[in-house]
Amino acid sequence: MVEPNISSYLQNQLKQAQELEENIEKIATQRYQLDLSLKEIEKTLQELNKIDDKTPVYRSIGSILYKVDDKKKLIDELEEQLELTKIRINTLDKQQKSLEEKYKELQAAIRERYNQDNKKGAVS
């Protein structure tokens, strides 16, 4: 809860800090979902590489399963999806790091300004 005697500047800074926290949390959630997807793709590729080329392979689209005629094409698609997922994870990591740095800077600025305002209030 915001104290009523905090300056509007500090209130604005606190609001920005809360927004940064929310964005960091959203990115962490997206990162987690991509990690799950990455593991699933890797596991699928491992299993596909274990089986014989003559073994029938099925792919799930929603609630429908259909037979895959070209296992090699499916593996290529999954490997491409794997690479794209890794790129997205890397991008999210960079975004999260940047937001965390901004958050730390903002935290320091808020703390400094709050201390300055309190000193002024103590002198008055």
Curated annotation (Swiss-Prot):
**Chief subcellular location:** cytoplasm
Q: InterPro entries attached here?
A: PFD_beta-like, PfdB, Prefoldin
Gene3D superfamilies in alphabetical order: 1.10.287.370
Alphabetic keyword roster: Chaperone, Cytoplasm
Recorded GO terms, molecular function? unfolded protein binding
* Cellular component terms (Gene Ontology): cytoplasm; prefoldin complex
Q: Which domain of life is it from?
A: Archaea
Q: Which residues form a coiled coil?
A: none
Q: Which CDD domains does the entry link to?
A: Prefoldin_beta_GimC
Query: Cytoplasm as a keyword?
Result: yes
Q: Name one GO biological process term.
A: protein folding
Q: Where in the cell is it found?
A: Cytoplasm
- Write out the function statement from the record: Molecular chaperone capable of stabilizing a range of proteins. Seems to fulfill an ATP-independent, HSP70-like function in archaeal de novo protein folding.
Which protein family is it in? Belongs to the prefoldin subunit beta family.
- Its quaternary structure? Heterohexamer of two alpha and four beta subunits.
Please identify the protein, giving its name as recorded: Prefoldin subunit beta
Q: Which organism is it from?
A: Thermoplasma volcanium (strain ATCC 51530 / DSM 4299 / JCM 9571 / NBRC 15438 / GSS1)
Per the record, the gene is pfdB
